[in-house]
Curated annotation (Swiss-Prot):
Name of protein: NAD-dependent protein deacylase
PROSITE patterns: SIRTUIN
Primary subcellular site in the record, as a coarse category: cytoplasm
GO cellular component, one term: host cell nucleus
Quaternary data: Monomer.
Cofactor note: Binds 1 zinc ion per subunit.
Pfam families membership: SIR2
Binding residues annotated for NAD(+), in chain numbering: 13-32, 94-97, 179-181, 205-207, 223
Gene of this entry: cobB
Required cofactor(s): Zn(2+)
Length: 241
């Protein structure tokens, strides 16, 4: 890096929130907190056993709001980057928590949904929802008697705000991936899209991802250590411009 950046796109995955105590989906055995993905993260699972699915996300929602779950140094550094950079910072996250927002980031795209929101199964109306969702709980905002569900993108469903994401990737002059495995598409392909439009690319991870060869620069270690260091470097270049 030797010149200031004006359009930075940051992709974050489970690795950035793991340091804050958020348990992650284990792709190698298809389990999420000892539940089969087919049972708790698919439309079919919800149709088959809505009580199980609601209970699963209710527990995750309660955990997220526990006072012990806080944004870590990586989240805070990205919030500082957005506040201080003479340019635009877009955070695209695969995570369903609100730690980026609590860390100070405002321009956040949740491509997999948000745990603290609920959605009407019929109208797709989305509302803020910090309490448990009960089976049989109807939509509060429309007249259609339809079950409320977590505002989460399940396997087999379309990711959210993809048009905005690809527009941001086209404009990016720096693309940073933090805490991602590089095995879940379309997110795993974002580095290639950004490179095609001329962005410098950096990977920050505990270990090389499945797409590490796409990155021009690699930094391996804890996100809470590596992200603040990178942000300091970017802002130092910015002040010299």
């Amino acid at each position: 890096m030797n010149f200031p950046y004006r359009n930075i796109v940051v992709l974050t995955g489970a690795g950035i929130s793991a340091e804050s105590g958020i348990q992650t989906f284990r792709a190698q055995d298809g389990l999420w907190e000892n539940h089969r993905i087919e049972d708790v993260a698919t439309p079919e699972g919800f149709a088959r056993d809505p009580d199980l699915v609601q209970s699963f996300y209710n527990q995750r929602r309660q955990k997220l709001q526990d006072e012990t779950i806080k944004p870590n140094a990586a989240h805070l550094a990205l919030g500082r980057l957005e506040a201080e950079l003479e340019g635009k910072v877009t955070v695209i996250t695969q995570n369903i928590d609100n730690l980026h927002e609590r860390g100070g980031s405002q321009n956040v795209i949740h491509m997999h949904g948000e745990l603290l929101k609920a959605r009407c199964s019929e109208s797709n109306q989305v509302i803020e929802h910090t309490e448990d969702i009960k089976t049989g709980e109807l939509c509060h905002c429309c007249q259609i008697p339809s079950q409320m569900r977590p505002h989460i993108v399940w396997f087999g469903e379309m990711r959210l705000r993809m048009g905005e994401i690809y527009a941001a990737l086209e404009e990016a002059d720096l693309f940073v991936s933090i805490g991602t495995s590089g095995v879940v598409y379309p997110a795993a392909g974002f580095v290639h899209d950004a490179k095609m439009h001329g962005a410098h690319t950096i990977e920050i991870n505990l270990e090389p991802s499945a797409v590490e060869s796409e990155f021009e620069e690699k930094r391996y270690g804890k996100a809470s250590v590596e992200v603040p260091k990178l942000v300091d470097e970017i802002l130092a270049l910015d002040t010299k411009a």
